[in-house]
């Protein structure tokens, strides 16, 4: 079987680290990573727990394909109850850390309790121990990794850590590995910081040699890689341009949220697009884009490595930012750019580097800045209050806010609370573009009806990665649906949500789903695990996971009222583009979505659904 078969349990209050067998019944029912980690959380954590208390737990979980030769098989998920939303938080990351944990012989690490002082966990194959991290507290993500590799004399060490944002309680702090790969959303890094846990450093030399049927697995993996290579998105578009290629595409569709969703098209989209990363700068004659980059086992290589203009105001006297770094990608470029009306590409790169360096989510950060800039233009916030002039389009304000938030100083402390809490404090809660407290990603939910429904019903708050209907509504994958049409979208959203839960739990990247279906994943999982995992079986597992997450949220106090969208999307029509005049049809779609899910009229799984899914 491709599961390692054991987990680490770390009690931070007691300072103990113990090994225990993986619950194989749960593994077969929930697969791994997001699904299996969530099952452990649901069984062990009170849904009403304070996310930042010692009673909450935080889990790092790999999938059965993590660490194998399956393409993109380097993924892992961090699972906890999130502080930004109060809902279940499952945040996925790539890079090499997940594969390294699996190669050390572990499927999962569960942290419980709260340390009295900063600590980190060191794993070297079968040996795992908590160590003092006083020398790491206050360091950046980048510096923490550098210190650990040097002090442990192991340049191949893989580190998953927080920066100052996680230590300072930014509610959307991230867990970062390999310098610029992150479990970025929902504040998982905030929970890590609340437990005085700074990092997990892992070295694995055992490999993943327990694939059940190696010959069948290699054949299935090879066939699946060919599917990726032959696909226009995974074989051409993403390797050449990365996700940022979507900037002009979504802008032309008229669904690029601009200036806190007041507009749906950005006049500066071309200035912050993937195409803008390639030509030489006029100032220095050097390109923004240095190269692309792949995570462990990935044959897509969508990652970007770029370099800033050393003369830009944001880094002019900061040589530590002159080297190559990760980014930009579409979501960050949108959140730091169009969402705030900023078209200075260098400023976007700087703010993105700060997010990576100090460990916080650029989506929630950028979307919160959009609300701040709108409040500033309304006169609700003043320069004296926030420390800088902040009209829409101000690159200087964006960079200042990034520094403030990272360091937890000045108005940065309020930005770190997220848009829901900030706008409520200043009397304008309708200006928070969020669901369940988590900020919107880079697609307008009016013009693209399905993604609006996906935001409203996402178990972790507004999220494109929980049901990426953009594939169908914009890109025509697997079939083209009309973005402005709301009929049929409840069934489409459910299908994407269930399949995505299965992809996540297998341990592969969701970007493979541009080319793969679960029919491509199933033979790989089946050969690796030695159990019967058909496409239908995996889809059933995905549906089970979705409903389990939903029931956790219901028990935490979430209701039908939380499956909503901001007033702006429901009452203010799109002003331009193909969707001009359209608002979200969420009220019409939500009851049909509940029916498709087998839930009652209040959004609770019925007894028939629970029995069918084995909940």
Please place each PLM-identified region on the residue numbering:
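Protein-protein interaction/assembly regions in multi-subunit complexes
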Residues: 1-189, 194-235, 242, 247-276, ...
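Extended C-terminal regions of large enzymes
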Residues: 149, 156-160, 164-186, 192-615
């Amino acid at each position: 079987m491709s599961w390692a078969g054991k987990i680490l349990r770390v009690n931070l209050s007691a300072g103990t680290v113990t090994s225990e067998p993986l619950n194989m019944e749960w593994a077969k029912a929930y697969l791994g990573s997001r699904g299996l980690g969530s099952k452990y959380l649901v069984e062990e954590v009170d849904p009403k727990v304070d996310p930042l208390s010692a009673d909450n737990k935080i889990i790092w979980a790999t999938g059965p394909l993590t660490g194998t030769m399956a393409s993109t098989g380097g993924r892992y998920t961090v699972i906890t109850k999130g502080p930004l939303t109060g809902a279940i938080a499952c945040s996925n990351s790539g890079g090499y850390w997940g594969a390294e944990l699996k190669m050390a012989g572990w499927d999962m690490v569960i942290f419980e309790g709260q340390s009295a002082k900063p600590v980190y966990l060191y794993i070297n194959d079968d040996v795992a121990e908590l160590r003092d991290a006083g020398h790491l507290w206050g360091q950046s993500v980048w510096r923490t990794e550098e210190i650990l590799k040097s002090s442990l004399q192991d340049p191949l060490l893989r580190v998953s850590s927080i920066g100052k944002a996680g230590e300072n309680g930014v509610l959307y702090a991230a867990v970062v590995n390999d310098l610029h790969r992150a479990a970025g959303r929902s504040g998982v890094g905030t929970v890590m910081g609340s437990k005085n846990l700074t990092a997990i450093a892992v070295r694995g030399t055992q490999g993943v040699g327990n694939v059940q049927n190696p010959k069948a697995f290699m054949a299935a993996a090879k066939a699946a890689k060919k599917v990726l290579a032959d696909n226009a998105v995974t074989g051409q578009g993403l390797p050449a341009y990365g996700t940022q290629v979507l900037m002009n595409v979504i802008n032309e569709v008229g669904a690029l949220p601009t200036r806190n969703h007041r507009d749906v098209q950005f006049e500066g989209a071309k200035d912050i697009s993937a195409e803008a990363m390639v030509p030489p700068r006029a100032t220095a004659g050097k390109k923004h884009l240095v190269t692309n980059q792949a995570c462990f086992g990935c044959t897509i290589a969508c990652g970007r490595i770029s370099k800033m203009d050393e003369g830009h105001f944001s880094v002019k006297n900061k040589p530590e930012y002159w080297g190559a770094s990760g980014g930009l990608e579409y979501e960050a470029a949108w959140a730091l750019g169009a969402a705030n009306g900023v078209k200075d590409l260098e400023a976007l790169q700087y703010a993105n580097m700060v997010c990576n360096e100090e460990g916080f989510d650029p989506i929630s950060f950028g979307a919160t800045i959009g609300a701040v800039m709108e409040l500033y233009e309304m006169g609700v916030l003043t320069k004296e209050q926030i420390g800088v002039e902040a009209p829409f389009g101000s690159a200087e304000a964006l960079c200042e806010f990034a520094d403030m938030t990272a360091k937890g100083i000045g108005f940065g402390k309020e930005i770190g609370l997220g848009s829901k809490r900030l706008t409520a404090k200043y009397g304008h809660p309708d200006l928070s573009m969020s669901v369940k407290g988590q900020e919107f990603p880079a697609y307008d939910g009016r013009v693209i009806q399905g993604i609006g429904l996906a935001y409203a019903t996402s178990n972790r708050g507004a999220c494109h990665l929980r049901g990426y209907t953009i594939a169908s509504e914009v890109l025509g994958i697997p079939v083209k649906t009309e973005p402005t049409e709301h009929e049929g979208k409840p069934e489409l959203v459910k299908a994407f949500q269930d399949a995505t839960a299965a992809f996540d739990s297998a341990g592969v990247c969701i970007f493979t789903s541009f080319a793969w279906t679960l029919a491509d994943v199933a033979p790989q999982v089946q050969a690796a695990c030695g159990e019967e995992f058909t496409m239908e079986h995996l889809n059933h597992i995905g549906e089970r996971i979705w409903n389990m997450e939903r029931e956790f949220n219901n028990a935490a106090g979430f209701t039908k009222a939380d499956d909503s969208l901001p007033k702006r999307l429901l009452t203010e029509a799109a002003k331009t583009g193909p969707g001009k005049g359209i608002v979200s049809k969420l009220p019409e779609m939500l009851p049909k979505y509940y029916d498709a899910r087998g839930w009652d009229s209040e959004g609770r799984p019925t007894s028939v659904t629970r029995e069918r899914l084995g909940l």
